[in-house]
Design a protein with these regions (language model features):
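Active-site "cap" helix and flanking loop/linker of ATP-utilizing ligase/carboxylase catalytic domains
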Residues: 350-403, 431-475
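Internal, charge-rich low-complexity segments
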Residues: 50-80, 226, 230-288, 535-550
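Phosphate-binding site of ATP-dependent enzymes
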Residues: 237-373, 377, 414-416
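ATP-binding N-terminal substructure of ATP-dependent carboxylate-amine bond-forming enzymes
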Residues: 1-176, 187-202, 449, 453-550
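Rossmann-like NAD(P)H-binding beta-loop-alpha module
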Residues: 176-225, 229
Length: 550
């Protein structure tokens, strides 16, 4: 029986493209190969689609393969990348010849795979699994395109996605329904840019009075804690810096820049021009456009010798900033999934233990910078309250299939929910798989659940949803056959742990091997934990949720 062709959409033009790329790779690895044929569809910086050659799926980051070093045109090889000294890297939008020409974009994509139109995608896949993040990925844009072409897709629909990307709209809806919301206000970019110092000082006083001198500043349309600042008893300069950062603006001061040595300046430029830690490229410096890190470095070197500051402004900026009260309490994240009938069920919430005040991009995606404790360590009755609250909010926003809802619970049990997301990070250590393991689902099984419930949601909500019934029937037949063949799989023991100083590495490697084998057509992995010492040891069958503990 023919497998279901699942196009995995990952990458994209947003600031969260690297999170998407890593998550898409996880889906590609872990999707059940008995049922599905995974098709990696890379979305580039300009929104073009590309059937990605499999070897590039395993690159560490997008910039490691795209844009490529060379392109081949009419039998000739020509250089694609400009001179990039000091180990600088750029995304494709920093190369003007590519950014300004559709033909060049296609030439570049030909080096890493096969460019596809949406019409070609329509004929190549049966279902779209969306691992995209941020703008154009979880804001209703790609969902609308797929609806137009009648391609069923994973997750929430257009309206819920559009609401899920806008933190200010979320807060407004929560306030209207009195749903677990803290105090907040908003500030438009146009108002901030046109304000003089007196007006900015008035906002500074207003927000300090409103929020008791402890508040959070965040962009309204960004995820992964990009552009977020936590302010505690700030002075006016710190306040202005935080607001500017949320709008992806930054002042570089000569007094600080000129004190640094060459290595420190190069490091600063790398951080400034990285979408994950800074403004990204292209950007404006005092109104002048810069596409390359080296050109920006040269400009700052020359200009800051004669003037006190340079103002940097990202092309990929923000239109609105959210200012909200700081909440004291335990931070958590909760995945809510729908059952076959669309009814929400909240998985055991995870407590986030971080080294600093902010669960920032690095803490979220780099190992060792935060710990996840599942379920959160509070009174069991409060865990029930959290799960019920998350389900309530899920229904209020009209989410479908699954969502990730973050929040805080105070010392007296009051719950605040913020940043409801219509998608979740899908890397191996993410909340998405961490919490699924608590109810006995490995990544392969959980992805299958998301697929089936997404297909049912599209049947229910798409104007021509009945056309997807045959795909659902085919999928159900495939899974019935797969269950019948499961006893024929070769059982493979994956032994991890041990008693050496590297046992934590063994656990991580063992998890990765277990997860990849779980999606295999031929093998059934069995997780085994080894304990003891050099004189004696014991072997334990490791429960799935224990294997995913930090």
């Amino acid at each position: 029986m023919q497998k279901i062709r699942v196009g995995i959409f990952f990458g994209g033009p947003s600031r969260e493209r690297e999170v998407s790329f890593a998550g898409g790779r996880t889906v590609y690895d872990n999707i059940d190969k008995q049922l599905f044929e995974p098709i990696p569809i890379f979305v580039d910086s300009f929104g073009n689609f590309c059937l990605l050659n499999w070897e590039f799926v395993y690159k560490g980051s997008i910039r490691d393969f795209y844009p490529p070093t060379f392109v081949h045109v009419n039998g000739y090889r020509k250089s694609c990348l400009p001179d990039l000294p000091h180990g600088f890297q750029v995304y494709a939008e920093s190369i003007q010849s590519i950014a300004e020409s559709k033909d060049e974009q296609r030439n570049v994509l030909n080096e890493i795979g096969q460019p596809l139109t949406i019409e070609e995608i329509q004929s190549r896949i049966d279902f779209a699994f969306l691992a995209l993040h941020g703008t154009y990925g979880e804001d209703g844009s790609i969902q609308g395109l797929l609806e137009w072409y009648g391609i069923p897709y994973s997750g929430s629909g257009i309206l819920a996605s559009a609401m899920g990307i806008n933190k200010a709209i979320q807060k407004d809806f929560q306030t209207t329904a009195a749903l677990y919301v803290n105090d907040y206000t908003t500030l438009q970019q146009r108002d901030w840019l046109s304000a003089d110092t007196t007006e900015k000082q008035q906002w500074f006083v207003q927000f300090n009075v409103m929020f008791g001198e402890r508040f959070v500043v965040k962009p309204a349309h960004q995820g992964s804690s990009l552009g977020v600042s936590i302010l505690k008893h700030p002075n006016f300069d710190a306040f202005c810096t935080a607001i500017d950062l949320a709008f992806f603006r930054l002042h570089i001061h000569s007094s600080e820049w000129n004190e640094k040595n060459s290595e420190e300046k190069i490091k600063d430029i790398k951080q400034l021009t990285d979408l994950r830690s800074g403004l990204g490229l292209p950007l404006l410096a005092d109104g002048k456009e810069f596409y390359l890190p080296s050109d920006l470095l040269d400009y700052l070197e020359q200009t800051l010798k004669t003037q006190p500051t340079v103002l940097l402004q990202a092309h990929d900026s923000e239109s609105m900033v959210l200012i909200e009260s700081m909440i004291e309490g335990k931070e958590f994240s909760c995945i809510v999934v729908a059952d076959a009938d669309g009814n929400p069920f909240a998985l055991p919430p995870t407590e986030i233990r971080k080294s600093g005040d902010l669960f920032d991009y690095r803490s979220k995606y780099l190992p060792g910078l935060s710990n996840k404790v599942t379920p959160i360590e509070v009174d069991p009755a409060w865990i029930t309250d959290i799960r019920e609250a998350c389900c309530h909010l899920y229904l209020h926003f009209g989410f479908e299939v699954y969502a990730r809802i973050d929040g805080f619970i105070t010392d007296d049990g009051e719950i605040f929910l913020n940043d409801p997301n219509t998608t979740s990070g899908m890397m191996p250590s993410s909340f998405f798989f961490h919490q699924a393991a608590e109810i006995g689902l490995n990544p392969s099984a959980f992805l299958s659940l998301i697929y089936f419930n997404s297909l049912r949601a599209r049947i229910h909500s798409h104007p021509k949803g009945q056309l997807f019934h045959s795909l659902l029937l085919q999928s159900q037949n495939l899974i019935s056959n797969a269950h019948g063949q499961s006893t024929q799989k070769k059982k493979i023991a994956v032994i991890m742990g041990g008693y050496s100083f590297e046992r934590h590495i063994s656990m991580e490697s063992g998890r990765n091997i277990y997860e990849k084998l779980s999606s295999s057509e031929e093998m059934q992995p069995i997780p085994i934990f080894l304990a003891g010492d050099s004189s004696s040891y014991r072997l334990f069958l490791l429960p799935l949720n224990m294997m995913l503990k930090d």
